[in-house]
């Protein structure tokens, strides 16, 4: 048998097979061990990574906490409280009003202008605003204040840079925030945006709508006029949104709703109102008559046309602009005249006083006011016949004499009523609203100085046929005729009985060689006569007054000069003397009686 037969080969394989199997298992075990070791190493590395991440995370939390605490401490040390921020921002904010244009009245935000019945006043405002952070209070010697300022400036200039404000609504009250104290609402028609950089001037032009509560505003204006600043308690309820535009997107930063602003915290009412009140007072004080015409009326009274000197409305307020063609409509003025104490308490129901429409120029200068007056008699008894204890005159006599004395003032009260004439006068204030103003304001006292000087009223005094002689019982007697001529060129009349002088009293002082030697007292009322004349050259009205001098109760002031005067009369037949006359005249008019006092005049005359 051959040794290399197939059978032998198979036997050899079978013999060798057990010997080969243990080597394969050992290799497999080695591979498994390697894999286990690799897995363990990977697990260990993963665990170390997790531990490292955990440590880093915990360390990050600690660092962030420390950093957060540091930031909080920094903010606490550098960022002032909210109330300090608000107060100090007012100090660094600068505002200048360039133009305040009253556009007119509207029914609502979307409507056109309607000056007849509009409820909202549209106002166009041009103003400038800028921030001067150097004005932050206390930075000169307080490091905390400087840190606070630097923080606010950094946030404003580097972070915010610009902001915008939507003025949704601002409701203002005087007193508690209830309806009865409401002054009005202000609504913004467009956002207002400005730059927060240091001393960067922002030119702002925007429109607002104002819906006033007239009756309450008038009450507040009265407080200003009466300088009653202590009772002012003006607050505003703010509804506004502060936002920023970035990348074409709007980001709301702060929404203020029901935020209360107390205006006395930022405004000194007495200081800010001083200039406007002074301007208004100067305007009233400057009112004077430019022309005055009096004529008889068909109702047995008088009609008076009064033209005031052109006045300036709020002169010097260059920033205020009125709508072109604006006017004040026909207004009927209800008048009360002063009583004995000078208080305007006597109503005059028979007086009708109204102004013609007043055109308000754009420059507010040279505004012409014309008043038409219709008055019938008789006037109230308390005006004509009540005797005032301080001077035994009636209130009417006191008024007339004050008018004729350029050094005296007269206080009267007036309340207006709008007269609807059916013509579109483009009124500055809608008629119904203006009527509400007048009714709420009621009677407004006005003190004025009427520039109607009595010296201009007296044209000439004369004494004719004056004789000086010794009478019975060695009493000095003076007789003659006194004539007075009064300039009534303002009075258009052809009647003789509408105005007349019935009696006079007073005193005449006589001078010789500039020495007062004799006085003629007329303590009792003396009958007189008067006549209406018309100047032949001008046609102007005059009044001639005449009364007889016949008095034995002379007062000798200088006996020596009296002797010289009588000697001249004795040897020359006459002498020239100078006289000063001061008389009171009792008038009877279609309106009732009154007394003119202190009518003074002088002249020269011959004495025989």
Curated annotation (Swiss-Prot):
Taking the first listed entry, what is the main subcellular location of this protein, grouped into a coarse class?
Answer: membrane
Q: Which residues are glycosylated?
A: 115, 141, 169, 407, 425, 449, 453, 527, 580
Q: What Gene Ontology biological process does one annotation of this record name? A: protein localization to phagophore assembly site
The record gives the membrane topology as: Single-pass membrane protein
Keyword Transmembrane: yes or no?
yes
Keyword match Cytoplasm: no
Cellular localization per UniProt:
Membrane
Q: Which InterPro entries match?
A: Tag1 (IPR046368), Tag1_C (IPR055011), Tag1_M (IPR055010), Tag1_N (IPR055012)
Pfam families membership: Tag1_C, Tag1_M, Tag1_N
Cellular component terms per the entry's GO annotation:
fungal-type vacuole membrane; membrane
Residues where Phosphoserine is found: 27
UniProt protein name? Putative uncharacterized protein YLR173W
Provide the species name.
Saccharomyces cerevisiae (strain ATCC 204508 / S288c) (Baker's yeast)
